[in-house]
Each structure stands twice: as structure tokens, then as C-alpha cells.
């Protein structure tokens, strides 16, 4: 199935990214980074950027003899600004809506979330709130 999800590279490296690289299917992966750090810790940024680039290469470089491959796209921002971050968020909102239409899924209907809330309030002995 289709999944639109993300995580920080360092936190996801030993779980989600490993599943993407070594899993049993092909997938499309987007990695996003900025060419300009949003802080003054140059060495920290240098390591994070190297991590992102190495992760991109590792996600593409699956066993060439195997039946699966990953298509990895990198979105490189020149800097993280409210405008650029908003544009990236809008792009993924649009992607989620379009994929929902393509797969005949309503991404705005969340019966699982509603069921969770109903169960949680019941366990807490509280009435449901809207």
C-alpha cells in the first residue's frame, strides 16, 4: 500500500529507513534537507548533512540482483524559512489529497482516530467531547 510518512533521519535510521532499504518491496522516497543550517553549530550541521547524503545513497543502493529498487528524490532547500517550509508542507498536503483520490480513500475521514478517542474516554470514565 501507499504510505505518506516521515521522520528525522537520525531517529529513523535503525528502524524505518532500514525497512525502506531492506524491505520486500520497491518504494519512492523523498529526503529533504537545507543547504544552510538554521543554527550556528557548523560541525553539527556538517555531520547531519553527511548523514542525509549517505542515507540517500544507501536507500538507492539496494542489491542490484534483487527484484526491488527505491526511487529516491532529494528536495534541497537553500534555507529553511517560513515560506519555503510552508511550500513543502503544501506540496505534501496536495500529494496526500491526490493519492487519496487516486486510491479512492478519503484522507480527511479518520475512523481509526475516532475509535481510539471513544475507547480512551471510555477507559477514563469520561464523556466524549467534540
Which residues does each predicted region cover?
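A SIS-like phosphosugar-recognition module
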Residues: 1-130
Amino acid at each position: 500500500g501507499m504510505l505518506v510518512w516521515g521522520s528525522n533521519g537520525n531517529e529513523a535510521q535503525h528502524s524505518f529507513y532500514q525497512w525502506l532499504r531492506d524491505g520486500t518491496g520497491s518504494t519512492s522516497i523523498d529526503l529533504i534537507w537545507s543547504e544552510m543550517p538554521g543554527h550556528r553549530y557548523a560541525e553539527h550541521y556538517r555531520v547531519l548533512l553527511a548523514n542525509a547524503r549517505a542515507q540517500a545513497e544507501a536507500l538507492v543502493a539496494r542489491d542490484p540482483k534483487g527484484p526491488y529498487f527505491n526511487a529516491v528524490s532529494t528536495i534541497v532547500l537553500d534555507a529553511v524559512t517560513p515560506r519555503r517550509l510552508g511550500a513543502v508542507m503544501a506540496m505534501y498536503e496536495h500529494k496526500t489529497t491526490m493519492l487519496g483520490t487516486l486510491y479512492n480513500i478519503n484522507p480527511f475521514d479518520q475512523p481509526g482516530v475516532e475509535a481510539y478517542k471513544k475507547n480512551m474516554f471510555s477507559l477514563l470514565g469520561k464523556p466524549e467531547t467534540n
